[in-house]
């Protein structure tokens, strides 16, 4: 699978990298974010949102659990939803199921999920075409190593020229 690494020396650098990477996303994509408290998950999503043309302020949905924004760019994603989901407070499968993740995944937009390790409580695979894992690893006061790995992509289209 495909992977990319980047060393960020500041929150602004993390946002800029995420904004640039956002331009490569396709419809029906889920981005799973992993990292300790304060590692920069929300900062990364803020940059992702900026790269998708979201102009509203992007804040962590720790208490509301989900925020929805409308993607403005690139053209292949324009008008689709960007879901920012924070699973930090989720402790049980029942809590996870009340979020309506099935409905979110059916909307074919982009879902960015903080504290993605909590998805293990869900007990089923994610019904999405494109799945990315993003690990944010602090290596200094402001420095972060960002590792992005493609976890799942749709099979190549069948050859219909025969």
What are these regions (language model features)?
Residues 21-28:
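Phosphate-binding P-loop
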Residues 2-5, 91-162:
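Short phosphate-coordinating micro-motif centered on Lys-Gly-acidic
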Residues 31-33:
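Hydrophobic anchor at the beta1->P-loop junction of P-loop NTPases
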Residues 54-69:
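Short beta-strand-centered segment that lines the nucleotide-binding/catalytic pocket of NTP-utilizing
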């Amino acid at each position: 699978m495909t992977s990319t690494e980047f060393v960020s020396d500041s929150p602004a650098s993390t946002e800029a990298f995420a904004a640039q990477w956002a331009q490569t996303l396709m419809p029906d994509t889920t981005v799973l974010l992993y990292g300790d408290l304060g590692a920069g998950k929300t900062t990364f999503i803020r940059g992702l949102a900026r790269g998708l043309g979201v102009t509203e302020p992007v804040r962590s949905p720790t208490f509301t659990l989900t925020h929805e924004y409308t993607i403005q760019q690139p053209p292949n994603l324009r008008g689709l939803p960007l879901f920012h989901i924070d699973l930090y407070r989720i402790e049980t499968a029942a809590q996870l199921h009340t979020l309506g993740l099935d409905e979110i995944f059916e909307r074919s937009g982009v879902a960015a999920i903080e504290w993605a390790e909590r998805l293990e409580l869900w007990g089923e695979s994610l019904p999405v075409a494109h799945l990315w894992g993003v690990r944010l690893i602090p290596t200094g006061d402001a420095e972060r190593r960002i590792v992005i790995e493609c976890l799942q992509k749709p099979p190549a289209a069948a050859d219909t020229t025969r």
